[in-house]
């Protein structure tokens, strides 16, 4: 099972969590989320999505995070990615979804926090690899550390 952390719980971060819960919960475990919004607000936003509807999971909040179904997710509120303790929660991969930390040097701050790899959800600068699904995604090498996958808009 791959353990991931999500930095940024806006639209992209929430959609990634929802996709994992609905399609990959036996393969991917979200162990932590970092976002400056309150735990209660973020729990509400994942439960009730204006486009995708209500998620079919019970969500409970605590002072440290929330529980979705049987899955506990730790929540941090750090502005600096270097201060997020990804290693302590066992996150192998961090999904960078803030739209702020788009270059290699800023993405590397997640590595300082204990993550092994970083995937940037927006077009990155000076990253090891940029994936365009259906164009070069088969060229992805597991040895890469900083990966950028520009967000696709499906209409």
Place the predicted regions along the sequence by residue.
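N-terminal Rossmann-like NAD(P) cofactor-binding subdomain of oxidoreductases
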Residues: 1-148
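A short, hydrophobic C-terminal helix/tail in secreted or cell-surface proteins
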Residues: 147-155
């Amino acid at each position: 099972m791959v353990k991931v952390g999500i930095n940024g719980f806006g639209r992209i971060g929430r959609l990634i969590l929802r996709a994992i819960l609905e399609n990959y919960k036996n393969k991917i475990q979200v162990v932590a989320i970092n976002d400056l919004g309150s735990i209660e607000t973020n729990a509400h936003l994942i439960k009730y999505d204006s486009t995708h509807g209500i998620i079919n999971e019970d969500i409970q909040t605590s002072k440290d995070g929330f529980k979705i179904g049987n899955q506990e997710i730790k929540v941090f509120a750090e502005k600096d990615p270097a201060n997020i303790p990804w290693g302590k929660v066992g996150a192998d991969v961090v999904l960078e979804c803030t739209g702020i930390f788009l270059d290699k040097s800023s993405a590397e701050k997640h590595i300082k926090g204990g993550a092994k790899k970083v995937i940037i959800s927006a077009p990155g600068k000076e990253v090891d690899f940029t994936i365009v699904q259906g164009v070069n995604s088969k060229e992805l090498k597991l040895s890469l550390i900083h990966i950028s996958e520009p967000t696709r808009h499906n209409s």
